[in-house]
């Protein structure tokens, strides 16, 4: 059945709530976990699930993402019987047609799907952190004889209003769907992972495109329309780790979830590896008086100070007598001596001068950029 499934990976999001982190790159391309990018998780899930036909739909700041994915070699997607295809908004004679929404993005690339004529289409978001066997979801979808299946996860009631919320009966059949309700009546959230019968999806997209009142979004328009037509929609309950990293704080939290003896998200799990494009760098160097505790420190780093419960990306230099705690330091950062940083994400490629101090109060998470350093520079 997996050979009859094509995955469509939505990777064109701007991620405006991540502020400066997405100024020059799309949200799925944001670095994560010391050596990865967010999109690595969805691509690795496809590879580990045996799904080898993957279309990646880009839009905002696509150049880095396009070159990063390339022909898909790190994820074993450079193959003759499938492979990865980069699908960008296309140009007509008069203009470039930008995607109007998530459903519009799939509709504009329907010819890619028509050529392959899959039995099922797997719709994925490229900006979530999780490990999932899509094969099991496809089997569940077939067992239920569903027209569409939506992966769902229980979220806290405080967060429920941020997500698409589903209501189901005792057979896990979806009875209603609300997109980001002000007063949620359920805490069963859509993960943005959908399986459709291709025949059902093709028809739904055609009708949605003709609807001038539609915002052309799966959650707001396509799913409610299918429910109104009494199509068979089922919820697939997911019990593993899943994180929407749409804000600076949630991105920081997801990185912190990688740390400890028994982390919520285990990067060292051998039977479900996360693949990435890895630069050819020398090993990390840890000086005699340096100290590293409960941290991930990537290749090419030199550490002379102390690092505690932090994630350090490639080619980071940490000077003597400096202390980094509960922080994420992106690649190519130079940290001077006598620096103190806590509860922060440090943007890539910046220089932190000697004596710099960033220790927020009340559990706040800082985003330290070049502009922030200039504003708070020690005189």
Swiss-Prot record:
Keywords: ATP-binding, Carbohydrate metabolism, Glycogen biosynthesis, Glycogen metabolism, Nucleotide-binding, Nucleotidyltransferase, Transferase. It is an enzyme of class 2 (transferase). It catalyses: alpha-D-glucose 1-phosphate + ATP + H(+) = ADP-alpha-D-glucose + diphosphate. It comes from the Bacteria. Disulfide bonds: none annotated. Pathway: Glycan biosynthesis; glycogen biosynthesis. Alpha-D-glucose 1-phosphate binds at residues 99, 164, 179-180, 190. The keyword Nuclease does not apply. Pfam families: Hexapep_GlmU, NTP_transferase. GO terms for biological process: glycogen biosynthetic process. InterPro entries: ADP-Glc_PPase (IPR011831), ADP_Glu_pyroP_CS (IPR005836), GlgC_bac (IPR023049), GlmU/GlgC-like_hexapep (IPR056818), NTP_transferase_dom (IPR005835), Nucleotide-diphossugar_trans (IPR029044), Trimer_LpxA-like_sf (IPR011004). Gene3D superfamilies: Hexapeptide repeat proteins (2.160.10.10), Spore Coat Polysaccharide Biosynthesis Protein SpsA, Chain A (3.90.550.10). Its EC number is 2.7.7.27. Involved in the biosynthesis of ADP-glucose, a building block required for the elongation reactions to produce glycogen. Catalyzes the reaction between ATP and alpha-D-glucose 1-phosphate (G1P) to produce pyrophosphate and ADP-Glc. Belongs to the bacterial/plant glucose-1-phosphate adenylyltransferase family. PANTHER family: GLUCOSE-1-PHOSPHATE ADENYLYLTRANSFERASE, GLUCOSE-1-PHOSPHATE ADENYLYLTRANSFERASE-RELATED. Homotetramer. This is Glucose-1-phosphate adenylyltransferase.
């Amino acid at each position: 059945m997996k050979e009859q499934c094509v995955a469509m990976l939505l990777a064109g999001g701007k991620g405006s709530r991540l502020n400066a982190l997405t100024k020059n790159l799309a949200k799925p391309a944001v670095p994560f976990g010391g050596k990865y990018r967010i999109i690595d998780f969805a691509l690795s899930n496809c590879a580990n699930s045996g799904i080898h036909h993957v279309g990646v739909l880009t839009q905002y700041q696509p150049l880095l993402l396009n070159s990063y994915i390339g022909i898909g070699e790190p994820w074993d997607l450079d193959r003759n019987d499938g492979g990865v295809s980069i699908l960008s908004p296309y140009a007509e004679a008069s203009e470039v047609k930008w995607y109007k929404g998530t459903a519009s993005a799939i509709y504009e690339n329907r010819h890619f799907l028509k050529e392959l004529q899959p039995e099922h289409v797997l719709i994925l978001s490229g900006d979530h952190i999780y490990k999932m066997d899509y094969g099991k979801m496809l089997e569940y979808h077939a067992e239920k004889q569903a027209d569409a299946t939506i992966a769902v996860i229980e979220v806290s009631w405080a967060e429920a209003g941020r997500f698409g919320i589903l209501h189901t009966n005792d057979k896990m059949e979806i009875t209603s769907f609300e997109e980001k309700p002000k007063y949620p009546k359920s805490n069963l959230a859509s993960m943005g992972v959908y399986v459709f019968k291709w025949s059902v999806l093709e028809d739904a997209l055609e009708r949605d495109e003709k609807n001038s009142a539609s915002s052309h979004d799966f959650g707001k328009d396509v799913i409610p329309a299918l429910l109104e037509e009494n199509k068979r929609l089922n919820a697939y309950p997911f019990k593993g780790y899943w994180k929407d990293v749409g804000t600076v704080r949630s991105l920081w939290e997801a990185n912190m979830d990688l740390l400890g003896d028994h982390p919520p998200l285990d990067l060292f799990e051998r039977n479900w590896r996360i693949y990435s494009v890895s630069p050819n760098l020398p090993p990390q160097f840890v000086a005699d008086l340096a100290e590293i505790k409960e941290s991930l420190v990537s290749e090419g780093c030199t550490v002379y100070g102390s690092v505690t419960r932090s994630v350090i990306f490639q080619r980071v230099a940490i000077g003597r007598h400096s202390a980094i705690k509960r922080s994420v330091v992106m690649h190519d950062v130079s940290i001077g001596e006598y620096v103190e940083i806590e509860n922060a994400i440090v943007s890539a490629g910046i220089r932190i001068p000697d004596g710099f101090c960033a220790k927020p109060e009340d559990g706040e998470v800082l985003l330290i950029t070049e502009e922030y350093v200039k504003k708070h520079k020690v005189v």
